């Protein structure tokens, strides 16, 4: 998937506007393409005077609010913005997903005060493929959280500049494919982590998704993208 039209990836200053804090807003239309909508969550402490990590969420059935809810508590705890597409699909043509990304990406940069080096992407199933593709093709994504995903051609994965947290149910039909990504990242000496959970092909439980965010926080410390928090590191290693 290579149909990204927004390749000028410099972060723009946030446009002044009313954002609802501490609650999931189910539908926000993009100013770039009003046919594209997404759900969002910003922490209670959000202020445009500082920059915040942002997580792009891609559900394979366009369930933006539902998918955002899975990350809401972790986003509040760690101070992340969540933006979750209402348009991404799986098992279909590329064009709807390309339109969703091309409408979301610049709009999110305009509306929210985001940290340009702390942009993350996650997805489930086909949404995980989309998240990985976005990271591969833009070099603008710091980390990918892949849930029950696969890769179209694992052998072609190369020069991975982002951190990867993979997870899948132990009876998920994409379980082995997710582990193949893990094996390839090991070969490339990339930064990775994999955790399974009991279950079939579905989004991971909230507590596991929270750990994925926590792990990304630790990786950000290693990369000098945020101050070191020794207490957080200790909790993450427990």
Task: Identify what each model region corresponds to.
Residues 14-52, 126, 133:
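A domain-start/cap signature at the N-terminus of enzymes
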Residues 44-51, 93-125:
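Gly/Ser-rich "nucleophile elbow"/oxyanion-hole loop immediately N-terminal to the catalytic nucleophile
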Residues 50-61:
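Short beta-strand element of the alpha/beta-hydrolase
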Residues 66-83:
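Short amphipathic alpha-helix adjacent to the substrate-entry channel of hydrolases
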Residues 67, 109-111, 117-162:
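Primarily recognizes the serine-hydrolase "nucleophile elbow" in alpha/beta-hydrolase
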Residues 165-168:
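Short beta-strand/loop motif that positions the catalytic acidic residue
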Residues 170-176, 202:
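Acidic catalytic loop of the alpha/beta-hydrolase fold
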Residues 179-182, 186-238:
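C-terminal catalytic histidine-bearing segment of alpha/beta-hydrolase fold enzymes
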């Amino acid at each position: 998937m290579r149909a990204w039209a927004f390749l000028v990836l410099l972060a723009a200053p946030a446009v002044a506007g009313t954002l609802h804090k501490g609650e999931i807003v189910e539908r926000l239309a993009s100013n770039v393409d009003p046919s594209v909508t997404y759900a969002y969550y910003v922490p209670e402490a959000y202020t445009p005077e500082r920059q915040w990590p942002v997580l792009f969420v891609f559900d394979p059935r366009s369930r933006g609010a539902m998918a955002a809810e899975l990350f809401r508590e972790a986003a509040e705890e760690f101070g992340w913005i969540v933006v979750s597409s209402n348009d991404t699909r799986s098992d279909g043509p590329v064009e709807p997903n390309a339109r969703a990304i091309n409408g979301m990406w610049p709009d999110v940069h305009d509306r929210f005060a985001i940290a340009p080096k702390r942009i993350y992407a996650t997805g489930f199933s086909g949404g995980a493929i989309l998240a990985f593709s976005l990271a591969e093709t833009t070099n603008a994504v710091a980390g990918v959280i892949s849930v029950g995903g696969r890769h179209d051609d694992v052998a072609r994965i190369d020069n991975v500049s982002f951190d990867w947290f993979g997870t899948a149910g132990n009876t998920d039909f994409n379980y082995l494919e997710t582990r193949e990504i893990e094996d390839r990242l090991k070969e490339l000496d990339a930064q990775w982590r994999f955790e399974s959970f009991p279950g079939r092909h579905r989004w991971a439980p909230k507590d596991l998704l929270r750990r994925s965010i926590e792990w990304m926080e630790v990786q950000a410390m290693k990369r000098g993208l945020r101050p070191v928090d020794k207490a957080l590191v200790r909790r993450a290693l427990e």
